[in-house]
């Protein structure tokens, strides 16, 4: 294969040019000499072509003398024609005889009569010219556009260099000092100033100045200037080149002029812009020759500057120049940026030849590796192959004859086509291609008709359905392409999803229903209790109608079991089963046990079955099995006769009673509200809660009613059995529909949300079978509309998120087998409330252990470090009662470029350790982005019904076990129970092995009814609290004394007429009179030991104690009502994921303690409280100002730990990184992102999120340079700092100190080392400007850069090519990858053998 590449490389093109070999690309500023060296002549006239002869005008924008001939090998006047004069220059018209395509590469130039500043370096922020000259952009613009003079050389006068003078001041100065000083205006002045800069001297001056500056702004500016100047010095760019004396002209074929009918021309906007420049330049030359008055020349120079600005970047300054149709002209900058620009349209997204598209239909008779290709399409796509075959076999003498035969569609053509197509895979793609499974290879089968036929099982991967979807077909041409398509992209090789490692070739819908139907059992069906010798006998009995398909019978089956050491052993057993399950058993491959299918085959069970088939028996058997399952499922679904009828939606008889009860409860609350017991917010909350609960009750009654029917068994007694109701079967099997949808059909529709997301408190009590009233229908339309609108918006948002993710992760590739790090993440089961949402075995599956795993009970090693955990080992860990495992993670990987295979672990899509060269970054981005789009397209399936659960108010234990407190602080109440006074407390329940099975959050103020370490029974209540209010709990006993609580000033008191009770409510700051704005209402406790304890009351607190009352420990002083909750829906979810990955600071985020110590409150300012923490270690006191409206969770004198919450709110990821480290941050982001996806039932492996987080943590901020070359405040790559520090430490010098920086994915993509990658992502102008000024080099390490320059990517099969190139450069490459082509051969032959089954 390498030789093939060598041959490809030695090829030369028609002009005898060999393609250039290069390793990196550098971008810089061009000097005037350089521009002239590119040019083939000066463009002097604005004319384009002669409209009569259509020949280009001499010296014009399309001049043949400068740019080359218009026709191949023919000069303009026609004196020299044909190849033999190649290279001759015609003496008459001056045109060189050569190919016309040189008009695509030869440039020209324009000599500018006056220098012009390049707008990118002037206006692209920060202005580079401004930074170098240390002038403001406004001042430079005034000079450039001829509004003021600037002093370029003050001489002996009192004027200063860089000083701006108006006309008046200039003439006054002239009169006063004569020509002792010089001042100029326009770009010449700026050019002179730039020439005068002595970079060396300035750099050393700044280096001395920086350590002495105290002001933050001056320091920032100085370090920016220093960086820029050093970049200029190192890159050999000269500052004065930012002002141009010569303007390059683009080759004419890149700005074409096309004749339209009717004698008009269509032209590129660039020609207009160039014409403007040339016209003004020529006019200026003439004016200068005529020595015209200064003011006229000045105006012309300004216009020249403006026209060059428009050519380079139209609209960057002032109004954009428009063409005849009032549309702004497209300048050079617009050509390269944006979705339609050069990067994204032509370099990253090319169109391909040999492709076609058509509508898709179902191909239920196909095998998994096949697709149906219409004959018409195949004939067109494989034309070149057919021509070659016809010629080779002698059926056609020439290509022309072959072409004729194909056009006539003679019979032999079809034979040849069938021959060509055999063994030649084609690729099918469905847009949008959201992950790599959106493009797969199949073997084509020729079919009649015009629609492509697609195998039903791959629909899930393509996200395709047959309601008019279209798909594209591509033909891999070269042998290598066919080999890759076969070995890597064949649909049979992509059985597992790269996102979560579960099978993606899983039956759905009809197939599931069919399999579920035949594996159900029924009481007292025909033939119940019969005995059969084997499955053949069952088949006969079924066919003759002796036994029903659901009857409970006994059957003798022969099964092959694979035991522990991989040996197969045959067994014969008698099982209780049904004839239907025997039908299924006939297609199950040898090696799976009967018990796997001796149950109801719901979608979950089928998925498990396919998964274990893949793990135990390998790819080939699984593929055959999946196909067989599909055929069986389709057939049985048809025969079952399951369909939906109105009668199937059974409305529960208890419905009315449940609703009546709820209405009574609501009425009671309304009455309480009218009497003033509850606030409006509380009333709303409680009502919504009641209806949410009622809805659940109706739904439960309905499901109970639907799911079971009473039947008579053989003995004639009543027996409950699962219902054969069609709707219930569809939902129960997982084929279609969910409990939530059935609830709306036969229960009640429930609560609906308004367009703004708040819940309407009157629910829809009817269901779809009963029908909706006009009002109910109207309320429903909100949700339906919102669903559709959301879908449209979210698709775009989700696509954009994927694009950002791909961009940030694209250069992460597996580069080495093991980096040798000891670090990693500690994995524990993910528990929320009473459910183990993700058990430990799922979380560690496919990971490598980072240290020895020991059993908790006797500390014995269960697993050595460095083991890849597979299904078997994961099950052993669970049996050994291991509760946490430290595993390797990409977060901790120490590879310089990319990540190592050990830190990544298992390749999810292949089920074994990941191969070097696997592009894990892009895989991660696709895995996270793909469900984003799918979910957003799915928002409206529940029809906007508010999925809101009633608020929890207690912890009820599910399993028997012992209680564990996790950072819970408690005080003992007088009545004997404990009261929680911690904010982040959790309560866990551990089983007898010590493994935690449940975990609940404990709110502040909860009453805990049990002690730490005590045993509890299942169903026991451990803690209770009021979900609608937030209490203030005392931690000491004493006498209450009101402070600054004045009626009408800071508080308002309400007396209830019915009970005579008075409650005091604290007013919000905004509602207080002026006198109360700065007061802080509080309750002071005069404690029994003579001290006093302040409890400040937040706004809206309802005080529940009286002035002077005696208070015990754990009593409640007051309650703050809680706000209402919004509905959760991925609509909130997608932006949430984007926020997490963009590392945005949330509004009103939680305030964390920066140091550990004792809290006190200092002197407060107008709107803020001053929080003071006195550290334990005696370092300096930490102070922070917190706005008064924030609820502060800590009291005077309380002790806090670093990173503990001081004021509640959403977490700020930057704080977590700073105070708790990168592992805590990773866990936070992974769990938060997973929460959003889990809510939608989408499984994504944690690995993928970690990969993105690794890319977000690439940079560090230097806090102290030490003896390294870094400057304080600089942003550097983490790996670079670590390497530099190691080098410095080796010489016993001081290393640099740094803080890890968390960057959002957009920022991280733009701050990558590769300017090509960054420019093709976003903000093209800014990226290129910066890269050019600093003379950046691009090492072409990532995938994107290599695609742009048209190379194989350094991943997958392209990695070998890149490693080989690096090795040949003899730069002692870091590691060698011996390419083992025997593996590829093996894969190839295996692929060829797939025909046989």
From Swiss-Prot:
Q: What is this protein called?
A: DNA-directed RNA polymerase subunit beta'
The gene name reads: rpoC
Protein family membership: Belongs to the RNA polymerase beta' chain family.
Which prosthetic group or cofactor does it need? Mg(2+); Zn(2+)
Q: Which organism is it from?
A: Acinetobacter baylyi (strain ATCC 33305 / BD413 / ADP1)
Role played: DNA-dependent RNA polymerase catalyzes the transcription of DNA into RNA using the four ribonucleoside triphosphates as substrates.
Subunit info here reads: The RNAP catalytic core consists of 2 alpha, 1 beta, 1 beta' and 1 omega subunit. When a sigma factor is associated with the core the holoenzyme is formed, which can initiate transcription.
- According to the record, how does the cofactor bind? Binds 1 Mg(2+) ion per subunit.
Instruction: Write out the residues that bind Zn(2+) 1.
Output: 75, 77, 90, 93
SUPFAM superfamilies recorded for this chain? Answer: beta and beta-prime subunits of DNA dependent RNA-polymerase
